[in-house]
Amino acid sequence: MTTSAPEHLSLPLGDGSAVLAFDVGGTDMKAAIVDDVGRILDIVRVPTPIDGERTADAVVARIGELAQELLRNHPDVRPLAAGLLVPGHVDEDNGVGVFSENLGWSNYPFRDRAEATLGIPVSFSHDVRGAGEAEYRLGAAAPFRDVVVMAIGTGISGAIFIQGTLYSGGGMAGEMGHSKVADGPKCVCGGHGCLEAVASAGAIARRYAQATGQVVSGAKDVLDRAARGDVHAMEIWESALDALALDLSHTVALLAPEAIVIGGGLSQAGAALFEPLQRRLDAILTFHHRPQLLCASIGENAGVIGAALRARDLVDDRAAAP
């Protein structure tokens, strides 16, 4: 277990309700507690409990344990709601995790189970849409009305804002990772040549290992090898950039965003990602408006901050209801 010290949590959320927040990822999950003046008092990070068909039950049980730990450490805080973000396809209206290729659940009633475990109302959403809301309200996407926030990590997905409103498409919008960009590797969704199977951080490392027989620690290792002239690493990185640029060109043609904000682990490559990606995108586009490509600014805690914001929204909405 790792806990982020409060001095590192520098995004005040403002006055509002005290809440709990949970961000479930494919590798790790985070839990946070926020007080009524918007201070993020604690963030706890633990491995996501992977247990086959029982993974969703294990996740909810772990949420309960983390909540108890946070409340023990901060006994004066009385959360009025919680926010829960999970990966995969979600039905926000009914609180259901419809399908997760990477974690294996199907039609799981996350909101009901989490509310039963925590004893407070729960706002339920998709992990990238939640992180996107944090970037839109508090981060690099804040200056824009029409903007896409894209996360490139274990998978690839996005949050779409049109005229300042998050567009969810019934829980299915923003699945850029499962658009076809090449005749290529099989994806966990069952398709072939999906962007996620070519250009996600996990895919870059996996493709290099398959091409060379050498196990690497991650996409950063592949980028480092490419910078040193490793031909296989260079080819894999170049193909990932080509696929990303093609996918972004489709996004631009369809939505004409003012900006595309990129977060997730791969965004940490910095100029090695953004400069060649911008050149490739510019080469594809013709008459289209060219969006700014920006690095997400909130960092690795964007998801759990987004979950906290959504939990506060839930409290406010219920208070305002007739």
Q: Where are each of the predicted segments found?
A:
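Short beta-strand segments
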Residues: 23, 83-87, 149-155, 159-161
